[in-house]
Amino acid sequence: MDNLFSTNHELIPKIEKEKLLKQKGICLWLTGLSGSGKTSIAKSVAKKLHSKGFITKVLDGDNIRLGINKNLSFSELDRMENIRRTAEISKLFVDCGIITICCLVSPKEKMRTLAKEIIGEKNFYEIFIATSL
């Protein structure tokens, strides 16, 4: 049986969108302890980039859990699903040439590896926020 669903959804290639926007679509994945300042840093970076003419989108783990991930608990399995869904959303923005800043605790290496695999290694920048609480 033929696959009814195409895996190639892009009518216009990412590179063409990036040329139009004059920027590269990337994901800055901010990770660190709860309360370490990930969201505050992400908002500050987004404002600074906007002032320089860049289009950004902040995906905050707390806000994502209020919407698309509201059915998930904090079990390890659900945390992995939270990361997977957020990474898939980020990839949609990245593929449109948008700088996406994700703020998630993502405490396990396998969680961050999953996000990197979904988004793409060349588009993924992991930033660990290490602050005293």
Which residues does each predicted region cover?
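Glycine-rich phosphate-binding loop of ATP-dependent small-molecule kinases
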Residues: 1-103, 107-133
